[in-house]
Amino acid sequence: YLGNHGNLLEDSRTACQLVRLERPLLSEEEFDRICAIDRVGFKPRRFRAVYRRDAGEGALQAALKQLAEDVEAAVRDGVNIVVLTDRAAAGEVPVPSLLAVGCAHNHLIRAGVRTFADIVVECGDAVSPHDFAALVGYSASGIYPYNAHACIRDLAVHGDLDVTAEQGIANYNKAATAGIVSIMSKMGISTVQSYHSAQIFEAVGFTPEFVNAYFAGTVSRVGGMGVEDVEREQNEIGRA
């Protein structure tokens, strides 16, 4: 569901004004419709999760801080559908989608306004069921994997698929959703709503400071990379 869930301890009609999603994976049409909602009770806004490659060391951390502040300010201003996008222009580097979602999610919790908005993510780095399960587990209500869909369209154009691009994307979304359900079932969870924001993961290879800042509450027994290391890795990927 998307929208303002309000205070769970108070009876309010406005908390019932929600958009119901059939599944976490969205088509381009569904994603565009969410971004363009123009009805009383709904206020979507898009936020770019990117940073300048030439901004120097600390650019990723600064971008995450700015993203968190912008999202909080927007939610306090009435935005109840937060759309995070990693589409980058020339000279920009995308923030990993899971990191962007975790950053926004944890900051809104600390600010005490998490239930007032839901998060939708437009991402190019998520392609597998595990990627999607992690995003849902860290509070993404809707996911539009534009790169994966673009690859399917390209395969269809070149005749490498036995179905149309639209059917291929529908099959992909259905299979990915089945993958999420399979992962959930191994944890004894039967509904996506119960898995949403549950954070049933263990972080391996990240410093406690990094985990506490962006994935608070996640078990982490093996340290390793910090935000500076993630930034260097993203910069290398961007140059490839």
Q: Where is each model-derived feature located?
A:
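Hydrophobic faces of well-ordered beta-strands that scaffold small-molecule active sites
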Residues: 45-47, 82, 117-123, 136, ...
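Flexible, glycine-rich loop/tail regions that form catalytic "lids" or insertion modules at the edges
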Residues: 1-61, 70-74, 78-81, 131-132, ...
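Glycine-rich, proline-tolerant flexible connector loops at the mouths of alpha/beta enzymes
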Residues: 84-99
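Alpha-helix-loop-beta-strand connector modules within alpha/beta enzyme cores
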Residues: 95-119, 171-176
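Conserved, mostly hydrophobic/aromatic
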Residues: 86, 104, 135, 191
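Catalytic cores of alpha/beta
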Residues: 125-138
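Glycine- and other small-residue-rich loops at beta-strand/loop junctions that grip anionic moieties
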Residues: 93, 121-125, 169, 187
